[in-house]
Amino acid sequence: MCSDPNVYKNKYMENSNLNIQTILQSARSGAAIYDSSDWGKILVSDRDRLRFLHNQSTADFEKRLAGEGCDTVFVTSTARTIDLATGLILDDEVLLLCSPNRREYLFNWLDRYIFFADRVKLKDVTDTLASFTLMGDESAGILAQLGCPITDLPQHSHQVYIIDGVEVRIAIGTELGLPGYRLICDRDKSATLHQSITNLGAAIVDEDAWECLRIAQGRPKPDAELTEDYNPLEVGLWDTISFAKGCYIGQETIARLNTYRGVKQYLWGVKLAGSVAVGATITVDGEKVGVLTSCSQIDGGILGLGYVRSKAGGVGLKVMVGDVEGEIINIPFVRHEYPV
């Protein structure tokens, strides 16, 4: 028996990291499933639902038809980020999928903007609906084996299928930008659905592995990359923004930043030579150029996310993060090119 608790701790961490690497590989080139049931789910209904969401977020909801969907960013009146969400357009409702730590905040924020003449209703259905993310290159094959052959459909398009007696809404795409699908069903049927998928070999993604994937892909998270310190253009969420739809909350600031090429900092990945605390200052030649917002051990190294001043440089820039050497790298989920 080992008398030194640190030896046991280090051995446990090695085994844990090895397991996470196996899960990460499955999520990319194989198949893996993540239980996202605690992510917020808000039903927006009644006559003005599309116009309401159109006016409250960055995406063009009024052009969307039932069976379609889109990512959108909810921002403050000064275009500071609240959350990155997905809207699935149903026949008579819109199902908003939002971050777990923004569920209550976003519901109350939306409710505050429903005025007397608006025909809009909100309902939090997080506790009645389960959701899963099935990801990886082999995820389509698993769904095909379950009787759901899905091919060549647009991102976020969705429809209802039956899997082992369970009614499941399957949407194209994942929260991470990896190949895969989001699956939504009644909570009381979720165990059956989960078992059907894992029986076909999908690895289970736990919260630690999910956080590693999130950082590696560069998906921003509320209270880390999405805060009132940053706007959607700094985050790199250009594809969630309609520049042609007219007024919405925060639109004036976003339009001005785009028109005058005024984005002063960008979210990047940071490849680190060692561990460093979140919140550490990013410097170049002793001058502060940014801040580290997330960090984890991934793919045998340390990766982080952080904001860096645009004038300092981008991919390939050598930096110090605290007292640790680092290099700015690209992250797949975001982009930083102004539209043509």
What are these regions (language model features)?
Residues C2-I82, L88-I89:
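Acidic, proline/glycine-enriched N-terminal capping motif
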Residues D4-Y8, T78-R80, Y230, V235-I241, ...:
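Glycine-rich, small/acidic residue-mixed loop/short-helix segments
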Residues I20-S29, V73-L84, I114-D118, Y161-A171, ...:
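Short amphipathic beta-strand starts and helix->beta connectors
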Residues A32-Y34, K41, T86-P220:
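Acidic, low-complexity central loop/insert segments
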Residues D46, L96, L134-G136, L183, ...:
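Residue-level signal for inorganic ion chemistry
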Residues S57-E62, L110-F116, C148, I197-A202, ...:
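Short, solvent-exposed amphipathic alpha-helical segments in soluble enzyme
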Residues F74, P149-I162, S275-E287:
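Short amphipathic alpha-helix segments
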Residues R182-W268:
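Anionic-ligand-binding alpha/beta catalytic cores of soluble enzymes and soluble regulatory domains
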